[in-house]
Swiss-Prot record:
Lineage, opening ranks: Bacteria, Pseudomonadati, Pseudomonadota, Gammaproteobacteria, Enterobacterales
GO biological process, one term: L-tryptophan biosynthetic process
Pathway involvement of the protein, from the record: Cofactor biosynthesis; tetrahydrofolate biosynthesis; 4-aminobenzoate from chorismate: step 1/2
Name of the protein described by the UniProt record: Aminodeoxychorismate synthase component 2
Enzyme Commission (EC) number: 2.6.1.85
GO molecular function: 4-amino-4-deoxychorismate synthase activity; protein heterodimerization activity
Amino acid sequence: MILLIDNYDSFTWNLYQYFCELGADVLVKRNDALTLADIDALKPQKIVISPGPCTPDEAGISLDVIRHYAGRLPILGVCLGHQAMAQAFGGKVVRAAKVMHGKTSPITHNGEGVFRGLANPLTVTRYHSLVVEPDSLPACFDVTAWSETREIMGIRHRQWDLEGVQFHPESILSEQGHQLLANFLHR
């Protein structure tokens, strides 16, 4: 079962739908509706941290979940979840040079992890005004994808199964979103 932590964002349900279409059993819980003990009792096999309209500091249990389950369970962070992943390990989340709300843009990636087998460059949909500051990215992460302006669009932990994407693979305008999520689901 995938535990999908909802950071009060409607895109959470797009992620839910995509994972269900891929055959996953998914349980959605709001970021303020469960504890780490509750999660232990649920015994998820994977965790997804959803997008949201706030900063990682305002994302309920999301930061604690990443810190607690890093190295224990595979975790995928999407948009806010991606930012929370970097911040949980000491990275800084800052205002983006340009607000991207409902905009598509090409990204380049390294072809590994969730990007395995995907087009390169890949057109994705972005809904964010914050980004991970490149100079602050903890050394335990590799940058796996970047925009034309070199903003970080994907990260992966060097040792543990933690991966984040700044964009929205669950948006209908993103290319190969199902495949990206399948790459996370089936590893």
